[in-house]
Amino acid sequence: MKRFVLAFAMAASILVGIVSTPARAQESGATKQRLNVAILIFDGVQIIDYTGPYEALGAGRRRNVYTVAEKPDVITTAMGMKVVPNYTFANQPTPDGIVVPGGGNSGEAGVQPHGVGAQLNNEAVIRWVRESAAQVKYVMSVCNGAFILQKAGLLDGLTATTTAGYIDYLAEVAPKTKVVSDQRFVDNGKIITTGGLSAGIDGAMHLIEKLEGRGAAIQTALGIEYNWQPEAGWSRAGLADRRIPGPVYNVFYNAETELVDMKTAPDKAEEIWRTSSELSPAEMLKRIDEALASIKWTRAEGETMRKTSASTETPTVSRWRHTDAQGKSWEVAINVRPASEARGQLTITLQVARV
């Protein structure tokens, strides 16, 4: 009996070791050639965009992961982290794969270039990406790093995605690329693009699966304690709240505005906001209506009216419709009401649904 218990305990210990430590590869690391993965970093890079893939891809003996930058200087990331790159373009090991993270803006007009926006004007960076892509086995962008791939000419004729807030802009600047919003990452074979931030981890997990199989990817996910859901298909850019146009928020958003609650899905969403304003509910609603009219949305039927005195009625809900670039029709309903008895507090409910 003692011999059986001892044997069982030893087997359990071996099993736990296999699934909990990704570095303990099932094959001998000494007999496998390591894949060099270079992760580009630059001033303004988003932290999770490069550290997420670094953690996942670095969790195993088969990959040698390192950061690379144009110069050896200290990099200041988004949110102020200070990082020293492992290598520069001049002294890096020859990469077999590269990761291009995002951060900052994407070169849109009227803003000071920062992060990716600044790198789009950096010929040394664009040249490194272009020349590396010609030699490596895999290229992956994270977030708005896709704009760097686009500038390097790597997305023409392909399908791609990016972070939710830049989907439409990528489609605008990359007319030869099919830009999608309903996928967390897009695999074109050699070129992989992912959504924003944590989507880079899923892109890295997918790459591990491509390179080493589903089992190795599962083992890695367990080792880094990541709830990997390869079949989930969740995409931030594919959620309906993104269909509420920015000018609506511009009307009521201020330093004291807070999101009270939110529910969002691919075909419908609801947001409840509380804000401070000296406007009455009717005045606030009127300004939101004017904002929607200014961007060519169409007023829909079904406006709800409320008596504010014996002789007047004021709308409390207005509805507007719009057809997006993919031909889908959306309706937004706006409800404005006092948040409390105290003057100067409003509750604004925004609902959007596909119709």
List each model region and its residues.
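Conserved Rossmann-fold dehydrogenase catalytic segment
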Residues: 180-194, 225-226
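Bacterial N-terminal signal peptides
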Residues: 7-18
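Active-site-proximal catalytic alpha-helix in oxidoreductases
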Residues: 192-205
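Residues that mark the start of a beta-strand
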Residues: 34-38, 159, 190
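A conserved active-site-flanking secondary-structure segment within enzyme catalytic domains
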Residues: 155-182
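Positively charged n-region of N-terminal signal peptides that target proteins for export
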Residues: 1-4
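Extended, subdomain-level signal for the structured scaffold at the beginning of enzyme domains
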Residues: 25-139, 147-151, 181, 205-355
